[in-house]
């Protein structure tokens, strides 16, 4: 189908029961698991369980869409885990910067632009190599809700674009720098 990502979703893992992502997975016949952090003795044990599930499903790439819980990234998944952040990293990011907190911080600081960042996940919050960013202007009369809505629109373009680039083999990582080989002209 037009606009479809050139990927196969093999598993959905959630850190909360009853979330919309699990419903979407069920409707699409994608296997899912709910792994509650409280059921594990430590963050490391929780991370092992998450990535053991990914390995068992033969996942080549892990997408942390809406997964706010910190999870240690094992060496065999280095540069194979991606996330999106609702600001232009390295600004307005790190521990505690998620959801509307990010947008309110952008407004409180008086920033003129915001946006979103798709990045590889490493073992620090919002720190991994940046794959791509989209800029969103901050309007003088913005509220956190209004800015969040515009940033979300940008996220809905950026995340699939980044995933498609990775799936096509167009992305390589050299230290902190992500190189994107030209495929088709990007909008």
Residue ranges and their predicted role:
Residues 1-187:
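One-carbon transfer enzymes
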């Amino acid at each position: 189908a037009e606009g479809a990502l050139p990927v196969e979703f093999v598993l959905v893992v959630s850190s909360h029961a009853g979330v919309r992502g699990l419903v979407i997975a069920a409707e699409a016949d994608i296997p899912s698991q709910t792994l509650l952090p409280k059921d594990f003795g430590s963050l490391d044990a929780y991370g092992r369980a998450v990535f053991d599930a990914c390995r068992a499903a033969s996942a080549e790439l892990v997408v942390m869409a809406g997964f706010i819980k910190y999870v240690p990234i094992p060496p065999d998944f280095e540069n194979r885990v991606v996330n999106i952040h609702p600001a232009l990293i390295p600004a307005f990011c790190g521990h505690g910067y998620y959801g509307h907190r990010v947008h309110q911080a952008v407004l409180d600081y008086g920033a003129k632009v915001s946006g979103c960042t798709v990045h590889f996940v490493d073992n620090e919050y919002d720190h991994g190599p940046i794959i791509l960013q989209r800029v969103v202007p901050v309007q003088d009369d913005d509220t956190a809700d209004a800015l969040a809505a515009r940033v979300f629109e940008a996220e809905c373009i950026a995340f699939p674009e980044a995933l498609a680039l990775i799936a096509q083999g167009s992305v390589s990582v050299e230290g902190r720098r992500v190189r994107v080989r030209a495929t088709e002209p990007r909008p």
